[in-house]
Amino acid sequence: MLRYLMVGSLLVLAGCASTEHKPIPDDPYYAPVVPEEPPVALEPTGSIFLDSQAASLYTDIRAHRVGDIITVVLTESTQATKSANNEIKKGSDLNMDAIQALGGPVTISGNPLSLGYSDSMNTKREADADQSNSLRGNISAHVLQVLANGNLVIRGEKWISINNGDEFIRVTGVIRPQDITTDNTVVSTRVANARIQYSGTGTFANSQQVGWLSQFFLSDWWPF
């Protein structure tokens, strides 16, 4: 019996474990976007300079084509507080007077026979959660797609190797050309459908993960 209990416990603990996708450098999903240049018809002007390859001093340097680079200024700050209280009380009482039989009360050793029952239950739970995050920095991203309304789909990542681990920042989302500043930057609060990921790999990142036994106590499998 003990053997089956141990096997069942191992299966439950194995079910609590999750197979998390580990990020890797040079992920093809975040590879730089190389735009396809349209064919340029040669202009028979007799000059060595072509208008299609000329750049004006007044040309807008802000990203607007597929493959252009734009810098995202990360200014993220979030704070969340949550509390929950739950209290359940339940009780019941049952009393019966002395039992009558043959015109008089039923007695045992001279004491009238009566019935009584009483029970109560009180369950109280409290939970508090407080979390705050702040992210500051810059990351350059490529323009992945230009939508029909002119909005730009961007995506990029940055890897930094520090001591015994690697840290990375990833960003994807949609921006408006109007939100791009003259120095070709856009703040992260202006990125729609933003997916900003800041994490790491290595010894330092692994030390912040919750152990498998703690995951069991924090999971829905823990009955208390």
Curated annotation (Swiss-Prot):
A lipid is attached at residue 16 (S-diacylglycerol cysteine). It is a lipid-anchor. InterPro entries: Flag_Lring. Its main location: membrane. The keyword NAD does not apply. It is found in: Cell outer membrane; Bacterial flagellum basal body. GO terms for molecular function: cytoskeletal motor activity. It holds the Pfam family FlgH. A lipid is attached at residue 16 (N-palmitoyl cysteine). GO terms for cellular component: bacterial-type flagellum basal body, distal rod, L ring; cell outer membrane. Residues 1-15 form the signal peptide. Keywords: Bacterial flagellum, Cell outer membrane, Lipoprotein, Membrane, Palmitate, Signal. Belongs to the FlgH family. Assembles around the rod to form the L-ring and probably protects the motor/basal body from shearing forces during rotation. This is Flagellar L-ring protein. It comes from Shewanella amazonensis (strain ATCC BAA-1098 / SB2B). The gene is flgH.
